[in-house]
C-alpha cells in the first residue's frame, strides 16, 4: 500500500527543505525526497547551495581573504606577520566540515518538525503520484494531495571546453583544488566566475577571466559595474570582455584555450580552467509523460506568480522555474507555496529580490538600476556616498566603493539601492526592508543611524538624493 501525504516535496535544496519544514509547521503531513550523494557517500540535504555552492564558496572566500589580510593588510594596523603560508588542503577540509555540520542540521530540523525524508530519485507521475527510486534501485509510489517540485539546477557545460577529471572543471570542481594553480583560467565573468577567481587570485594564482559579453555585469547598475571592473582588475583579475571560447586542448597537465576577441584569435595556456557560464534546470527523468506539467521554451517548468504549474495541486519553485537562480528566492517561494497550500494568502515581491556577488569588496543591489529606469522613461534623482568618506570604513581600512540610492524624481520613492563596498550584502538588505514598505529617500534620511557604522553610508546616500548629504559636498541642492 502506498503512503499518503498532504505535501510531497521533490528536492531538499534551499527551496525544497524550507518548503517541507514550513508545510509541516502548518500541520500538513509532509515528505521530502533527495538523491544527492555527498562526499561521505551518503545522501546529503541542502542542495547545490549548501553542498557545492553558496556555503562552501563563502568558506573559501573568507579563508582566502584572511590570508590576504595577513600578508597585505595587517601591517597598516601595526601588526607584523612574518612567514604567512596557506595550507590549501586544510582550508578545503574546513569548508567540508562546515558543509557537513549544516547538512546534518537540516536532517535534525526535519526530525524536529515531523518531515518524512526519502532517499532517492523522485519522479512526478499522473494524478499527483510521486515515484521514489531508492539508492538500492527499489521503487515505491507516494500519494500526494500537493506536490512541490524543487529539483534545482546544474552547471552548464559547453562543447569547446568539455570537463575533465581535474584540469577543466565546473564550479563544483573548483571548490576542491588541493593546491594553488600557477595560472588559472575562468570562462564566465558572472557571480560564480568572479567569486571563484577571487579565491584563487588571493592565494597567488594568475587569473584570467574570459567573458563572451562585451559588457561587464550587465544586470548591475552601470556605475557600480564600472567601479567593480576597476577594483577587480586592480586586484589582479585579468578580465577579458568579448572573449568567446572556441576550443580547448588538454596536454601535459595543462589546458590551452582558444578564443576570439576584438583582436582576432587568441590562445592562453592554464594549469586549471573553471567553466562558469551559468546553470540550467534539472528536469531529467523528473516528469512522466502523463504528469501534465509543461516546460517553457528554455526548459524551465512553467508556473504562474504563485508557483502553480499547469496541473492543479502541483507547484514548482527555485532554479527549476523562471527568474533569478538564487537560494533566497527559492526559499521564499517555498514558504509562499507551503502557506498557500495551507489556505493562507501568501505573496512574494519579485521586484525586491537582492543580488549579491561576494567578492571583496562585495557587490550588491536591490530594485532597479539607473539605466533600466531611464530606459523606462522614469525621471530619477540619484544620491551616492563613497566609503572613503566613512569614518567606520576608514577605521577598518576598508574604504573602496560607494552606496547609491535611486529615487523617483516626482514621488521620492526609493526604486533601487546599489552598493559596492564592505558589507554590501548587509547594507543592501536595509534598503530592501525600506523599499518593501514604500520608503522615500527623505524617510531614510530622517532615520537615526548608529555612529560610527558602515550603515551611515546608506543614510548619507539617501540624504544626497535631495542634496542634503552632510559628510560630502552635494552636487545639487534641492
Swiss-Prot record:
UniProt keyword annotations, A-Z: Cytoplasm, Disulfide bond, FAD, Flavoprotein, NAD, Oxidoreductase, Redox-active center
Molecular function terms in GO for this entry?
Answer: dihydrolipoyl dehydrogenase (NADH) activity; flavin adenine dinucleotide binding
Q: List the disulfide bonds.
A: 49-54
Please list the residues that make up the active site. 451
| Keyword NAD on entry | yes
One Pfam family it belongs to:
Pyr_redox_dim
Q: What's the EC number here?
A: 1.8.1.4
GO CC terms of this entry: cytoplasm
Using the UniProt record, name the top-level EC class of this enzyme in a single word: oxidoreductase
- Spell out the subcellular localization from the entry: Cytoplasm
Q: Which cofactor does it need?
A: FAD
In the record's cofactor note, how is the cofactor described as bound?
Binds 1 FAD per subunit.
Classification via PANTHER family: DIHYDROLIPOYL DEHYDROGENASE (PTHR22912:SF224), DISULFIDE OXIDOREDUCTASE (PTHR22912)
Identify its protein family.
Belongs to the class-I pyridine nucleotide-disulfide oxidoreductase family.
Q: What is this protein called?
A: Dihydrolipoyl dehydrogenase
Query: What organism is listed for this UniProt entry?
Result: Pseudomonas aeruginosa (strain ATCC 15692 / DSM 22644 / CIP 104116 / JCM 14847 / LMG 12228 / 1C / PRS 101 / PAO1)
Amino acid at each position: 500500500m502506498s503512503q499518503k501525504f498532504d505535501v510531497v516535496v521533490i528536492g531538499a535544496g534551499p527551496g525544497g527543505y524550507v518548503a517541507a519544514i514550513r508545510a509541516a509547521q502548518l500541520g500538513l503531513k509532509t515528505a521530502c525526497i533527495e538523491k544527492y550523494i555527498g562526499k561521505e557517500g551518503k545522501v546529503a540535504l541542502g542542495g547545490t547551495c549548501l553542498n557545492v555552492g553558496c556555503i562552501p564558496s563563502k568558506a573559501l572566500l573568507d579563508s582566502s581573504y584572511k590570508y590576504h589580510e595577513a600578508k597585505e593588510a595587517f601591517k597598516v594596523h601595526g601588526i607584523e606577520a612574518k612567514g604567512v603560508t596557506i595550507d590549501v588542503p586544510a582550508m578545503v577540509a574546513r569548508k567540508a566540515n562546515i558543509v557537513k555540520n549544516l547538512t546534518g542540521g537540516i536532517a535534525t530540523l526535519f526530525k524536529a518538525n515531523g518531515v518524512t525524508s526519502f532517499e532517492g530519485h523522485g519522479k512526478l507521475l499522473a494524478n499527483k503520484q510521486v515515484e521514489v527510486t531508492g539508492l538500492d534501485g527499489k521503487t515505491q509510489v507516494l500519494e500526494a494531495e500537493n506536490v512541490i517540485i524543487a529539483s534545482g539546477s546544474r552547471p552548464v557545460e559547453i562543447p569547446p571546453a568539455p570537463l575533465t577529471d581535474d584540469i577543466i572543471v565546473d564550479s563544483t570542481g573548483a571548490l576542491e583544488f588541493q593546491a594553488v594553480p600557477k595560472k588559472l583560467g575562468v570562462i564566465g565573468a558572472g557571480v560564480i566566475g568572479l567569486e571563484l577567481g577571487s579565491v584563487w587570485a588571493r592565494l597567488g594564482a594568475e587569473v584570467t577571466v574570459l567573458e563572451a559579453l562585451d559588457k561587464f555585469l550587465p544586470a548591475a547598475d552601470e556605475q557600480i559595474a564600472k567601479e567593480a571592473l576597476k577594483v577587480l582588475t586592480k586586484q589582479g583579475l585579468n578580465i577579458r570582455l568579448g572573449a568567446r571560447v572556441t576550443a580547448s586542448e588538454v596536454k601535459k597537465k595543462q589546458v590551452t584555450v582558444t578564443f576570439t576577441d576584438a583582436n582576432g584569435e587568441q590562445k592562453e595556456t592554464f594549469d586549471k580552467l573553471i567553466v562558469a557560464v551559468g546553470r540550467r534546470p534539472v528536469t531529467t527523468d523528473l516528469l512522466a509523460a502523463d504528469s501534465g506539467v509543461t516546460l517553457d521554451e528554455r526548459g524551465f517548468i512553467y508556473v504562474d506568480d504563485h508557483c502553480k504549474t499547469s496541473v492543479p495541486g502541483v507547484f514548482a519553485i527555485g532554479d527549476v522555474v523562471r527568474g533569478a537562480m538564487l537560494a533566497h528566492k527559492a526559499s521564499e517561494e517555498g514558504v509562499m507555496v507551503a502557506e498557500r497550500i495551507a489556505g493562507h494568502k501568501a505573496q512574494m515581491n519579485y521586484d525586491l529580490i537582492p543580488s549579491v556577488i561576494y567578492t571583496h569588496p562585495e557587490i550588491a543591489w536591490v530594485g532597479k538600476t539607473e539605466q533600466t529606469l531611464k530606459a523606462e522613461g522614469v525621471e530619477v534623482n540619484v544620491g551616492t556616498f563613497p566609503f572613503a568618506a566613512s569614518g567606520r570604513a576608514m577605521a577598518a581600512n576598508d574604504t573602496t566603493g560607494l552606496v547609491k540610492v535611486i529615487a523617483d524624481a516626482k514621488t521620492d520613492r526609493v526604486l533601487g539601492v546599489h552598493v559596492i563596498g564592505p558589507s554590501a550584502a548587509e547594507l543592501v538588505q536595509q534598503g530592501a526592508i525600506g523599499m518593501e514598505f514604500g520608503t522615500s529617500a527623505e524617510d531614510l534620511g530622517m532615520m537615526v543611524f548608529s555612529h560610527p557604522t558602515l550603515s551611515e553610508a546608506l543614510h548619507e546616500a539617501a540624504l544626497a538624493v535631495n542634496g542634503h548629504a552632510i559628510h560630502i559636498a552635494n552636487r545639487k541642492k534641492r
